Amino acid sequence: LINLEGALTEEGYAVHKDNSFRGPTSYVNILTQNSVEAVTLANDHSMDYGQKGYDSTKAVLDTAKIPYVERDSSTVITTKNGLKVGVYGAVYYKMDVDQISADIRKLSKEADIVVFAPHWGYENSAQCNSDQEKIARAAIDAGADIVYGCHPHVLQAMEEYKSGVIWYSL
């Protein structure tokens, strides 16, 4: 599972922001050659090249048969060696702890392992914040096995909580 922080496209125009990220569509081969089993697009850069860039990214992933979580909160289930892994991705501006808990409870009924992949926290902060802790623990309480956080661009704490593992930022 990776957080695809940008678009795979030759289309679209960069949005007006400090950093806009994209790679050519051929970069999907890097993912397939390195056994990437799923991708989350639930981040602040998946729309860097507008709707055309986002649609191109999804089409390239579809062609490569790499399942993905959409940019706003959504889920995907992928099967590897008979094991169903459910991934739930969410972006900080769409995080409602009650909705996340309900979605994870539902996903845990369909998957053997549930990974919650939030895009959250403060950039360049090595400390997780109280909202991250609250949401991560609620996700585990609801049935997630792993919390795989991204966004701060630095490592944050790892915590074993009840029967789950939380990486606040990798």
Descriptions of predicted regions:
Residues 1-170:
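Acidic, metal/ion-coordinating pockets
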